[in-house]
Amino acid sequence: MGIITLLANRRGLHAILSNAQRIVGCRFVSSSIIPDASRLRNIGISAHIDSGKTTLTERLLFYTGRISHMHEVKGKDNVGATMDSMELERQRGITIQSAATYVNWKDHNINIIDTPGHVDFTVEVERALRVLDGAVLVLCAVGGVQSQTLTVNRQMKRYNVPCIAFINKLDRMGANHNRVLSQLRAKLNHNAALLQLPVGLEGNNTGVVDIIRWKAYYFDGDNGEIVREDVIPEDMVDECRKRRQELIEVVADVDPELGDLFLEEVKPSESQIIAAIRRATIERTFTPVFVGSALKNKGVQPLLDGVLDYLPNPTEVKNYALDAESLDTKVLMDSRRSGEAPFVGLAFKLEAGRYGQLTYLRVYQGALKRGGFIVNTRTGKRVKVPRIVRMHSDIMEDIQEGYAGDICALFGIECASGDTFTAEGAPLVSMESIFVPEPVISLAVEPKNKNDLDQFSKAINRFTREDPTFRVRFDDESKETIISGMGELHLDVYTERMRLEYNCPVICGKPKVAFRETIGKEASLDFRPKSRVAAAGQYGKVVGKIEPMPPESITKNEFVDATVGMNIPKNFIPAIEKGFYEACERGFITGHKVAGVRFVLEDGAAHAVDSSEMAFRMATIGAFREAFNKAAPMILEPIMSVEVNAPQEFQGTVIAGVNRRHGQVTGTDANEGYFTLFAEVPLNDMFGYATELRSQTQGKGEFTMEYCRYLPALAQVQAELMDRFNVEKLKKAKR
């Protein structure tokens, strides 16, 4: 089982074992790749910001013997948590990028990815969940289900990731596990039930009760590393019986085997209940709920046991790849760790390391061996694997090979995030790519010192390669470099990293909202050049229509070739498509990008001598401009889901402030003298809200926001944007 490390007040082994209660768990120290897939777990720790994810991960590392000392996220020793390896993370006390590690617990290997909780870094959660088999959803016992919890829940659903829930921070004033359980059921639609009950709340929390194994657990030693087993307190027995029966009923509703026992009025055994919970959790029809306090070192070891008991191993999850030749054909991955099947892996994250680009990779099939050759299915390029490492935060440990189910990292591999690699000579397949949300905010940046342009370019190139939500473009008209991202914090972190990591301080312009131009109705297009003989190679006629995309695709554009016959030679169709997408890059009424438009090409004409790709591309741009102005053009703006928490005495003031910012209140919640306001507010109206909220609530209020959707902007906003655009055009025309 491992080497037991006894750290409890320097007491001897005999003294500890002579206690009246039984010692059932300590710290386990061992580390190895275990070939048996049943003893492997790939999990992520996900939650809303400040729910205690990184603190929980620090305890997981300590109790499994992976680290010898625990450090806090904002500890007095100024060391910072192990998984927050970036200097900026330790300064700000937040997780900015996901970090991977692995531990050994009771002869099982657990790969862990600690993810950010802030919505601005949501792509880190997205790509982590894409490659994981299970997750721990951390919930604050006071805050409960919050805005980013909803986002993480959607991401888990998108990738069919089973999860167990951990209600953290039971030591805090106002902690209420029952309220959080109700929110888990009502807001997230989880079929959930408690597997544990806390022994006391707030300052009186001393341990947890396991209602399945019918035992109480207390956590002794300087750091809670010794798990002491005891009988359930007498005053909790009745509630534990009630909760156990509730648990059995909830699981019996979704598990046929336990359901049969329940209908036959047969009392299920401990092992039967655990097996039923495992089946239901893996099928995502039930969510087991654990309780504890990571900061106070309570409930973490039973949570580790829960990861082994209820979350799937790689063979219990079905992963599919798409046949590269026929993307409609799905290929089931062979998750056996024998290495007999051809290798398939997904590069899910890139990071610039000390020795070059570090590519994080999940092995889905077969074996990856050092010195072997693999093929990038996107580029068709054959590459050698010079070095394979396992990551422990920012520390690398060399390994010779990785098998199906392993998460490792490669050096010296040039690729993009989301690329699939296969064995040399094997059929080409492609893993389904990672969902990447569109940026919602932009600002202009330039280096303070013109001599830093080289470092500035290096930083920009690296960050865009690592983070698909961080976009960069050069505006030809203003001659500015424009960076775009998921929020002000997202862009602030990258500009700060330029200063810290590249010694390149930058000057930032004012943030700009990513407005979009779209159309409100269908319009026909029939465009031909004014004169066929105007210039050689300049004839091209396009006929068709443009129409609005459905609401769920409002941020996308689509080109449809509906031509019949050869009026337009097929070799000119790509030029027409290129012209359409080129025209969408800069709109006609405000200069913002065009979105939510479907371009249907129905007919056209070409000339045997005077037609060219350039002619059709320019004809398409002209046709699109004419049709766009006839199709009820309008401006879309990003709407944010906003969640405000503040003392109840400020509720009226806060609601009035949100209304002034053209927000729509969607709900409120009250708890222990505080209220939570849920609203949808245009991003354009959210600038400066943090300062206003602090002023309104005497510094006691806080808020979070995340992108929700695009909606038509208010008429006044649209008019202002169009007027500003027209004024700028006039100024340029006079120059």
From Swiss-Prot:
Q: Which domain of life is it from?
A: Eukaryota
GO molecular function terms here? GTP binding; GTPase activity; translation elongation factor activity
Query: Predominant location of this chain?
Result: mitochondrion
Q: Where does GTP bind?
A: 47-54, 114-118, 168-171
GO biological process: one example: mitochondrial translational elongation
Q: Which residues form the tr-type G domain?
A: 38-315
Which InterPro entries is this protein grouped with? EFG_II, EFG_III, EFG_III/V, EFG_IV, EFG_V-like, EFTu-like_2, G_TR_CS, P-loop_NTPase
Q: Where in the cell is it found?
A: Mitochondrion
Which terms in the GO cellular component ontology are assigned?
mitochondrion
Q: Which SUPFAM superfamilies match?
A: EF-G C-terminal domain-like, P-loop containing nucleoside triphosphate hydrolases, Ribosomal protein S5 domain 2-like, Translation proteins
Pathway, per UniProt? Protein biosynthesis; polypeptide chain elongation
Q: Name one Pfam family in it.
A: EFG_IV
Q: Which UniProt keywords apply?
A: Elongation factor, GTP-binding, Mitochondrion, Nucleotide-binding, Protein biosynthesis, Transit peptide
Q: Transit peptide positions? A: 1-28
Please give the family membership noted in the entry.
Belongs to the TRAFAC class translation factor GTPase superfamily. Classic translation factor GTPase family. EF-G/EF-2 subfamily.
Q: Which HAMAP family match?
A: EF_G_EF_2_B (MF_00054_B)
Q: What is the recorded function of this protein according to its Swiss-Prot or TrEMBL entry?
A: Mitochondrial GTPase that catalyzes the GTP-dependent ribosomal translocation step during translation elongation. During this step, the ribosome changes from the pre-translocational (PRE) to the post-translocational (POST) state as the newly formed A-site-bound peptidyl-tRNA and P-site-bound deacylated tRNA move to the P and E sites, respectively. Catalyzes the coordinated movement of the two tRNA molecules, the mRNA and conformational changes in the ribosome.
Protein's UniProt name: Elongation factor G, mitochondrial
* Species this protein is from: Nematostella vectensis (Starlet sea anemone)
